[in-house]
């Protein structure tokens, strides 16, 4: 009995504190949305729009923005009922901690962490955190941004799963994560130069690896292209049926042209 009263008192205290932080807005609770299974012949090929879930996620996004106005810059719900929250880079730890620990959120699983390179932007890298709430069967996508030189605070202190994800982003994109316990390359080889997923990284790379029969080991050499510019408008010597290639005369005629007489 005493434990039940204590739990009720603690929930009331949390609700009061959330109400105070939300500037008078009542707490918004994510409710699990049940999806009824359809038959094999009527099952849609794409996920249908759920208006109830869409309104609920939109209200929860506004609730998060009012509680954390210092960090949340934009909130939107995608067509597939996924909430996207765009935050300032300084708000990575506070926002992720709030979404993980808040009673009405409980996004305790970091499903994926990746980056997007858009060179035309001033802050060319977009860092994307995909979170999952098993309690409410809901997903949320947290986005932030940075450039080549500005580090992002590591999320390992909030989600242990971010360790290797951040190492992969550092290896592929060159985004530095501050306070990471072991930030080093994870996919490329030792001594690799550059970051392959950057849009300005050359398609051929900088070095090529091959096995040298003389030294009996794998060696790395600068890339040497025998032909810098290649024109592909030619007959391939490996073409199996060159005689069956469509002649220019039988190509599609323009409107008003007459068909040439057959010889």
UniProtKB/Swiss-Prot annotation:
Coiled coil ranges: none
Database matches in Gene3D superfamilies: NADH:ubiquinone oxidoreductase, 30kDa subunit
GO molecular function, one term: NADH dehydrogenase (ubiquinone) activity
Similarity section: Belongs to the complex I 30 kDa subunit family.
Main location: mitochondrion
Role noted for this protein: Core subunit of the mitochondrial membrane respiratory chain NADH dehydrogenase (Complex I) which catalyzes electron transfer from NADH through the respiratory chain, using ubiquinone as an electron acceptor. Essential for the catalytic activity and assembly of complex I.
Protein name, entry field: NADH dehydrogenase [ubiquinone] iron-sulfur protein 3, mitochondrial
Reactions the enzyme catalyzes: a ubiquinone + NADH + 5 H(+)(in) = a ubiquinol + NAD(+) + 4 H(+)(out)
Subunit structure comment from the entry: Core subunit of respiratory chain NADH dehydrogenase (Complex I) which is composed of 45 different subunits. Interacts with NDUFAF3. Interacts with RAB5IF. Found in subcomplexes containing subunits NDUFS2, MT-ND1 and NDUFA13.
Record's bilayer topology term: Peripheral membrane protein
GO terms for biological process, alphabetical: mitochondrial electron transport, NADH to ubiquinone; mitochondrial respiratory chain complex I assembly; reactive oxygen species metabolic process
Broadest EC class assigned to this enzyme: translocase
InterPro entries membership: NADH_DH_suC, NADH_quin_OxRdtase_su_C/D-like, NADH_UbQ_OxRdtase_30kDa_su, NADH_UbQ_OxRdtase_CS
EC code: 7.1.1.2
Record's keyword annotation contains Protein biosynthesis: no
Subcellular location(s) of the protein: Mitochondrion inner membrane
Keywords recorded for this protein, A-Z: Electron transport, Membrane, Mitochondrion, Mitochondrion inner membrane, NAD, Oxidoreductase, Respiratory chain, Transit peptide, Translocase, Transport, Ubiquinone
Any single GO CC term annotated in Swiss-Prot or TrEMBL for this entry: mitochondrial inner membrane
Presequence range in chain numbering: 1-35
The organism's place on the tree of life at top rank: Eukaryota
């Amino acid at each position: 009995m005493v434990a039940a009263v204590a739990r009720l008192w603690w929930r009331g205290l949390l609700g009061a504190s959330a109400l105070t932080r939300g500037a008078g807005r009542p707490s918004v609770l994510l409710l699990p949305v049940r999806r009824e299974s359809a038959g094999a012949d009527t099952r849609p090929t794409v996920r249908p729009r759920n208006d109830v879930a869409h309104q609920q996620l939109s209200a929860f996004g506004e609730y998060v923005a009012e509680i954390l106005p210092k960090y949340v810059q934009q909130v939107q719900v995608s067509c597939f009922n996924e909430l996207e929250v765009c935050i300032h880079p300084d708000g990575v730890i506070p926002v992720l901690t709030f979404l993980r620990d808040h009673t009405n959120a409980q996004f305790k699983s970091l499903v994926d962490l990746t980056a997007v390179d858009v060179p035309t932007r001033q802050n060319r890298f977009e860092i994307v955190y995909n979170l999952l709430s098993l309690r409410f069967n809901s997903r949320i996508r947290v986005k932030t941004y940075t450039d080549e030189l500005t580090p992002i605070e590591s999320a390992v202190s909030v989600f242990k799963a971010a360790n290797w994800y951040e190492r992969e982003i550092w290896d592929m994109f060159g985004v530095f994560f501050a306070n990471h316990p072991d930030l080093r390359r994870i996919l490329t080889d030792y001594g690799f130069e550059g970051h392959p997923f950057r849009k300005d990284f050359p398609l051929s790379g900088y070095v090529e690896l091959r096995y040298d029969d003389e030294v009996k080991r794998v060696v790395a050499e600068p890339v040497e292209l025998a032909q810098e510019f290649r024109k592909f408008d030619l007959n391939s010597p490996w073409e199996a049926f060159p005689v069956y290639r469509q002649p220019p005369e039988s190509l599609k005629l323009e409107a008003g042209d007459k068909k040439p007489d057959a010889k």
